[in-house]
């Protein structure tokens, strides 16, 4: 689970905040990833943030990625205003030396629509994406969903992103991460995800990368 550009997973909760910690084993890339997610609604909308760490360096963490999003929406507004920031950094090894890199800062400004209840829900937004050092205007469209089955014993959730990186006529990126969880109880779940991507993170073409994971609902 290597979310380099974006992730936006909102669980529609009436009056409660929610946070969870996930530990994933990525079989293709042969490393662990941890994810911490936090979601909190209020009378003016909701705030979502998460941070990913990849453990692919000999000494520990090889990459960190951070995202925070705010939806401004009251009960009288059918559509919310979406503001989001993405960014991160990482390390790599080459010829016995260690180097570093940054993931270009990105801001997204758009409109959000969400609908759901205790059993199912979805959220979607579309907006203008300003990527640092990109010479052209970009866009991003995101959809997230959740579905609770068999009296909440099974949860199917995830997201799908589509965005441009250098204007409308050049590189278009797709990333989706559907997750399936078996809920042992209210605190712990076992499951995993499949990262489905096209032209993502410097790779050309399509990839399918499965993980096995455990989730702790805090």
Predicted regions: what they are:
Residues 44-49, 74-81, 116-123, 147-156, ...:
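Repeated loop/turn-to-beta-strand initiation elements of outer-membrane beta-barrel proteins
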Residues 30-34, 62-66, 101-107, 135-141, ...:
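Residues that define the transmembrane beta-barrel architecture of outer-membrane proteins
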Residues 127-189, 193-200, 206, 216-218:
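Outer-membrane beta-barrel transmembrane domain signature
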Residues 1-20:
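Bacterial Sec-dependent N-terminal signal peptides
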Residues 36-40, 68-72, 107-115, 126-128, ...:
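Residues on the lipid-exposed face of transmembrane beta-strands in outer-membrane beta-barrel proteins
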Residues 23-25, 49-53, 83-87, 124-128, ...:
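Transmembrane beta-barrel strands of outer-membrane/channel proteins
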Residues 60-110:
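Hydrophobic/aromatic-rich structural module bridging two neighboring secondary-structure elements via a short loop
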Residues 18-57:
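Short glycine/proline- and aromatic-enriched beta-strand/turn motifs that initiate or cap beta-hairpins
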